[in-house]
Amino acid sequence: MSAPVHPVPGADGGDPLRPATPGLRSPQVPIQVPAGSTAAAAVSEAGLPTHGAPDAIVVVRDADGKLRDLSWVPDVDVEVTPVPVNTDDGRSVIRHSTAHVLAQAVQDLFPQAKLGIGPPITDGFYYDFDVAEPFTPEDLKALEKRMRQIVKEGQLFSRRIYESKEQARTEWAGEPYKLELVDDESGDAEIMEVGGDELTAYDNLNARNGERIWGDLCRGPHIPTTKHIPAFKLTRSSAAYWRGNQKNASLQRIYGTAWESQEALDRHLEMITEAQRRDHRKLGIELDLFSFPDEIGSGLAIFHPKGSIVRREMEEYSRRKHIEAGYQFVNTPHITKAQLFHTSGHLDWYAEGIFPPMHLDAEHNDDGTVRKPGQDYYLKPMNCPMHTLIFSSRGRSYRELPLRLFEFGTIYRYEKSGVVHGLTRARGFTMDDSHIFCTREQLHCELASLLRFVLDLLGDYGLEDFYLELSTKDPEKFVGSEEIWEEATAALAEVAENSTLPLVPDPGGAAFYGPKISVQVRDALGRSWQMSTIQVDFNFPERFALEYTSADGTRQRPVMIHRALFGSIERFFGILTEHYAGAFPAWLAPIQVVGIPVTGEHVSYLEEVAAQLKSCGVRTEVDVSDDRMAKKIVRHTNQKVPFMLLAGDRDVRTGSVSFRFGDRTQINGVARDSAVEAIVCWIVDRENDFPTAELVKVTGGE
């Protein structure tokens, strides 16, 4: 691998800068809260930190799993589990409380601002506001300053229960978005205002006299006071539709982040800076790989020559490995009649993700009357229904199973403009899509070998830090019987558990037709990405009446396994670009070698070396520009070219070249044949490290 794929320090929830304090009970050990006493008193009695420490307790979890404020007073003796700030739940609480502080600051500085929602999100929080003008960077600085004043004041978070919805409506009559939420029953996880057993507000109180300063409709929980926010930062602002619906008002969203310590915040901000440096959208332009022209539309990429080389290498290696593993390649069209997606269920369960239909094939008489009615065609959002038609195109025998079909199939999904994100969330993309048809008896072995194949192939591209996620049935959105789902889920769970990889449950996360295993990978920054999906489906074979002849001559239904290894070519391209910061392994790099002459007199010699490399299949160029050698080196270093070969008078005279690498190391005076051999071996061996003088082994050299 070219870079470590371990999480950044502290990403596991611990703070390596804070030494362990002896004598304190583990925050994970339950404690007793006596009836009539506060949770805070019980936490203090247990000797646990409640303020100032990176593992300070901010809330507790009751026996039902519900998070409770430290001010909570139970009616009976209860056992609770303290939740420290340096855990996912703890961070979520301080981030939500910080969002309240942000909203208070906005209404202090912009009194006409109307409040939207302000949930915690991964690594941060946001709050939506209806304001006359977009927020500027100067506004964010002023808001952050006001927030620090609020934090310093130590305002108390106080929970208040409404006696009725009517009481809440009266209080929030001047806040139209909050008023809408009073009656919300959507269950949307991002709506923190409602959804609990009671309709509540949280007031910010003056710590000295208890007077209400500000408040928000909210189900909680929250930290005790604003002083319990250790470290925060506002990061950016953007436009956002109210509740993500383009038909609603456009609001202004402010994003921020909050952490358990200044050190943890600093680490996170450093990671953000590094992530911005690695952003595939930025690198795609800088390295001339791909672009998103406005003339084509949002979420639709075009790959330039260099990007197409990387993509071709990705595809060709995958194609070869699939052929070796017994897959058969197929091709299907981009559009299909509507009936296919009625049969599959996509138009019933996935209509919001499909582009509008094209009405075609209608024929009219001269007088305008319809001679032949037309029909709707759809851009395909998935390849699976078409692959079932390949299976059913003729009779099948058990001897043909498992039948492994594979396609680089371009599909189209209607993603809202607000969620489109470069190559990783596009509207048109190519899935490396496989559908395997097997018997029930073959299912377990096929799943086990498939998971191993997926992990091995991803490892060949330099990704190695994996865990699995098991997505199970959404009770509100599924087809088929409970028994079929249980059988499919059990098969996937057994294979996942036998893999020895960490397994994370994802209840309700499956598609409507079957449960799935998702292979998650951590990149060089420790960020998690969903890669491959493996989905067991008993339902499509039933819906499409798929059959094979078994050994005893009876007709049986096959089991169908859906599998996308990269997820999509485009998404995998974007992830690899960020993982390697644009410095692709030499075997993937669009330009593998560039020759840099000291002067124009050395061009012809380097062109001979380039011809020798090209004859071995190495993508080689010679820089014949009029720029000075130093400028050429900088340019090709910035373009992430793995190998630079320099040549001057001495090299021409001795038949040698000098290696120059991206880390500024160099190997001088290497015989050209030895140089060619070293480069070819490095590429053929598919080394994923970026070459350096230390790593590249050559005969001779200085």
UniProtKB/Swiss-Prot annotation:
<keyword id="KW-0820">tRNA-binding</keyword>
<dbReference type="GO" id="GO:0005737">
    <property type="term" value="C:cytoplasm"/>
</dbReference>
<dbReference type="InterPro" id="IPR047246">
    <property type="entry name" value="ThrRS_anticodon"/>
</dbReference>
<keyword id="KW-0479">Metal-binding</keyword>
<dbReference type="GO" id="GO:0046872">
    <property type="term" value="F:metal ion binding"/>
</dbReference>
<feature type="region of interest" description="Disordered">
    <location>
        <begin position="1"/>
        <end position="30"/>
    </location>
</feature>
<dbReference type="GO" id="GO:0006435">
    <property type="term" value="P:threonyl-tRNA aminoacylation"/>
</dbReference>
<dbReference type="Pfam" id="PF07973">
    <property type="entry name" value="tRNA_SAD"/>
</dbReference>
<dbReference type="GO" id="GO:0005524">
    <property type="term" value="F:ATP binding"/>
</dbReference>
<dbReference type="InterPro" id="IPR018163">
    <property type="entry name" value="Thr/Ala-tRNA-synth_IIc_edit"/>
</dbReference>
<keyword id="KW-0862">Zinc</keyword>
<feature type="region of interest" description="Catalytic">
    <location>
        <begin position="279"/>
        <end position="585"/>
    </location>
</feature>
<feature type="domain" description="TGS">
    <location>
        <begin position="15"/>
        <end position="84"/>
    </location>
</feature>
<dbReference type="InterPro" id="IPR002314">
    <property type="entry name" value="aa-tRNA-synt_IIb"/>
</dbReference>
<keyword id="KW-0030">Aminoacyl-tRNA synthetase</keyword>
<keyword id="KW-0694">RNA-binding</keyword>
<comment type="subunit">
    <text>Homodimer.</text>
</comment>
<dbReference type="InterPro" id="IPR045864">
    <property type="entry name" value="aa-tRNA-synth_II/BPL/LPL"/>
</dbReference>
<dbReference type="GO" id="GO:0000049">
    <property type="term" value="F:tRNA binding"/>
</dbReference>
<keyword id="KW-0963">Cytoplasm</keyword>
<comment type="function">
    <text>Catalyzes the attachment of threonine to tRNA(Thr) in a two-step reaction: L-threonine is first activated by ATP to form Thr-AMP and then transferred to the acceptor end of tRNA(Thr). Also edits incorrectly charged L-seryl-tRNA(Thr).</text>
</comment>
<dbReference type="InterPro" id="IPR033728">
    <property type="entry name" value="ThrRS_core"/>
</dbReference>
<keyword id="KW-0547">Nucleotide-binding</keyword>
<dbReference type="InterPro" id="IPR036621">
    <property type="entry name" value="Anticodon-bd_dom_sf"/>
</dbReference>
<keyword id="KW-0067">ATP-binding</keyword>
<dbReference type="GO" id="GO:0004829">
    <property type="term" value="F:threonine-tRNA ligase activity"/>
</dbReference>
<keyword id="KW-0648">Protein biosynthesis</keyword>
<dbReference type="InterPro" id="IPR012947">
    <property type="entry name" value="tRNA_SAD"/>
</dbReference>
<feature type="binding site">
    <location>
        <position position="562"/>
    </location>
    <ligand>
        <name>Zn(2+)</name>
    </ligand>
</feature>
<dbReference type="InterPro" id="IPR004095">
    <property type="entry name" value="TGS"/>
</dbReference>
<comment type="similarity">
    <text>Belongs to the class-II aminoacyl-tRNA synthetase family.</text>
</comment>
<feature type="binding site">
    <location>
        <position position="435"/>
    </location>
    <ligand>
        <name>Zn(2+)</name>
    </ligand>
</feature>
<dbReference type="InterPro" id="IPR002320">
    <property type="entry name" value="Thr-tRNA-ligase_IIa"/>
</dbReference>
<feature type="binding site">
    <location>
        <position position="384"/>
    </location>
    <ligand>
        <name>Zn(2+)</name>
    </ligand>
</feature>
<dbReference type="InterPro" id="IPR004154">
    <property type="entry name" value="Anticodon-bd"/>
</dbReference>
<dbReference type="InterPro" id="IPR006195">
    <property type="entry name" value="aa-tRNA-synth_II"/>
</dbReference>
<keyword id="KW-0436">Ligase</keyword>
<dbReference type="Pfam" id="PF03129">
    <property type="entry name" value="HGTP_anticodon"/>
</dbReference>
<dbReference type="Pfam" id="PF00587">
    <property type="entry name" value="tRNA-synt_2b"/>
</dbReference>
<protein>
    <recommendedName>
        <fullName>Threonine--tRNA ligase</fullName>
        <ecNumber>6.1.1.3</ecNumber>
    </recommendedName>
</protein>
